[in-house]
Amino acid sequence: MATPREIKKRINSVKNTRKITRTMEMVSTAKSKKISDRVNASHPFSNKIKELVSSLASLSGVVHSPYLRRPEKIKTVALLVITANRGLCGGYNSNVNRLAKAKVAEWKKAGVNVRLFIVGKKGISFFKFAGEKAEKTYTHLDDKSGYKEAEEFANLFLELFANEEVDAVEIASTVYYSSASQKPEVTRILPFEPAKEGNGNDLVVYEPSPERVLESLLPLVVKTAFLKAILEANCSEQIARRIAMKSATDAASEMIKLLTRGYNRVRQAKITQEISEIVAGADSLN
């Protein structure tokens, strides 16, 4: 049986761990709130501009753009996987990695060549262990990442698509729906999906021409799509870490209770034993 001193040392160790997990929980809560505000603030703009570009793209026979090409058969697809650089966030990384791996297997089974691009150390190590070679890897994204990083990705994949090096661009990431709901999904970015035929407003006169307007706006839509994916992934990571750290803090508190009870029992037993020895010694003297 452990001595009172050993149990006390264990209690202090768990208390120190609880301080760390509680601090990490508070930091993740603050970060997730800040990023979710950015996500919600970007939605009206991204939704409206996507609606406008979708309407422009539906003007069949009027608008032509390399970004609107729709290959009869997809031969090569670019897949961007967004994970975190750090762990301690529950199943956040493993859920995205498993989904992306299943998607890669699905494409390969269909005879499609997959060009893999991975964000985050956790995704890089996962696919390296799985034997999947990544064309490019990125580890510079964090909770402060935003439009600059989104523009970097958008320019790369727009160029690949326009040059017909890939026939489709997809993102595997965690999609943020609310603070209580996040889900790993694969989102198609290119080719761009226009509105249903007939939804384009033919009564609108575009100045300059629809092609010029679309040429400027469509890359912006793609950039906002990447920005949305980055922000939502970061927000989901912080929420997952907050939940994981709260669970760890609660578990530490419960362990401290159990250890304290054990400490009190051992201490009480030791005191009782000492009293018994004193009484026995006094009796022997009499």
From Swiss-Prot:
GO biological process: proton motive force-driven plasma membrane ATP synthesis
Similarity comment text for this entry: Belongs to the ATPase gamma chain family.
GO annotations of cellular component type: plasma membrane; proton-transporting ATP synthase complex
HAMAP family: ATP_synth_gamma_bact (MF_00815)
Gene field: atpG
Keywords noted in UniProt: ATP synthesis, Cell inner membrane, Cell membrane, CF(1), Hydrogen ion transport, Ion transport, Membrane, Transport
Chain segments annotated as coiled-coil in the UniProt record: none
Regions crossing the membrane: none
Location, primary (coarse class): membrane
InterPro entries: ATP_synth_F1_ATPase_gsu, ATP_synth_F1_gsu, ATP_synth_F1_gsu_CS
Identification of the protein by name: ATP synthase gamma chain
Subcellular location: Cell inner membrane
